[in-house]
Amino acid sequence: LRAVMKPITKYSDNTGGGNNTASYVTSTTDYLPLLSEFEYHGTRTYANSAEQNFQQQYAYYQAGNSKVHYKHNATGTAASAWCRSVFASSTYYFCLVNTDGSANNNNANNSWALAP
């Protein structure tokens, strides 16, 4: 699988805890990235406000499709899913998508779904 995956450059707050510090938004090369808060929702609620200057909402979500993710072993049960965006006002929190598809954040030591 890795042999056919293509690298993609993503911009995110890769420092955290700096509120809305623009210089904290840097690039990384990923092969299977988590989406950012802005790429899901097209708005910023918790992430560093400078992230959105380098991102766009995915067309799939912009078209109004559901942001809800489901458990692989209980496909009728919704699961919260991590975003790659850090919560700008915290050192230990990341953004996530709630079970109803809305934006939220939670402590990084919690277990939530991963949905690239």
Ranges and model annotations:
Residues 1-115:
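Collagenous Gly-X-Y triple-helix signature in extracellular proteins
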